[in-house]
Regions:
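Acetyl-CoA-dependent GNAT
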Residues: 5, 34, 43, 47, ...
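Conserved N-terminal entry element of GNAT/NAT acetyltransferase domains
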Residues: 1-46, 189-196, 200-205
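Conserved hydrophobic beta-strand within the GNAT/NAT acetyltransferase core sheet
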Residues: 109, 143-147
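Conserved glycine-rich acetyl-CoA-binding loop
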Residues: 115-129, 138, 149-156, 160-161
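C-terminal "cap" of GNAT-fold acetyltransferases
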Residues: 148-151, 171-206
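Solvent-exposed beta-strand sheet faces enriched in polar/charged residues
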Residues: 99-101, 146, 166, 184
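Conserved catalytic-core motifs of GNAT/GCN5-like acyltransferases
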Residues: 26, 146, 159, 164-179
């Protein structure tokens, strides 16, 4: 009897969980207003990869930490990966990537990059807000990421969103072996963070 109940429970609530997950990972192309400027938001496509690599090079002094194969492998994993891009006038300005781990209930930000000339305009905050909200919808415990020790501007943004430093990874980054700061957002304590940025025509003021 107990086995039958467990099987019934798993079928009913497991399938419901899967529906919620599929809905959460789905993103419709839409326009958003961030600080009164209109942008276009969409899921990343394979055709976006060359521009994503160019943004990496612009951000990381000519280096591209991820190559086209790495990005393509990520985009194929639609069940547990989500990559979004922001465009204006058909130019890719920013992107973000995240893994969604059902076992640990953690959304891990794998990539976030904004063209230097568009930094400080709220694009990074907006993209993080989307991922945070999706993790909340999935009832996850945390959103996590790594950031260079030297990247104080990014650290300020993450702390403003209530991320906390949880550790240091020594020699983490390829090439220069710079240390990384581990940071986590504990969602049950910060459910109201990053409400902006998940619906069409959303206004991001910070």
């Amino acid at each position: 009897m107990l086995k039958k109940f467990k099987s019934w429970y798993k079928n009913i609530f497991g399938s419901r969980r899967e529906v919620v997950r599929e809905e959460t990972m789905d993103v419709k192309n839409h326009r958003v207003a961030i600080r009164d400027v209109t942008y276009f938001v969409a899921k990343a496509l394979f055709t976006d990869i060359p521009e994503m690599i160019e943004i990496e090079r612009a951000v990381y002094a000519g280096q591209a930490p991820w190559d086209s194969t790495a990005f393509a492998n990520e985009l194929r994993r639609e069940k547990d990966r989500l990559y979004l891009v922001i465009r204006k006038n058909d130019k890719l300005l920013a992107f973000i990537g995240s893994t969604f781990d059902e076992r640990t209930r953690d959304a891990h930000i794998t990539n976030i990059a904004v063209l230097p000339e568009y930094q400080g305009k709220g694009l990074g905050r907006f993209l993080l807000g989307i991922m945070i909200k999706k993790a909340q919808k999935l009832n996850y415990k945390t959103v996590s990421l790594e950031v260079r020790v030297s990247n104080k501007n990014a650290q300020r943004l993450y702390r403003d969103l209530q991320f906390e430093q949880t550790g240091i990874k020594r020699g983490y980054y390829f090439g220069d072996h710079e240390d990384a700061v581990d940071m986590e957002l504990f969602l049950n304590e910060n459910e109201d963070e990053a409400e902006d940025g998940v619906e069409p025509e959303t206004r991001e003021q910070n």
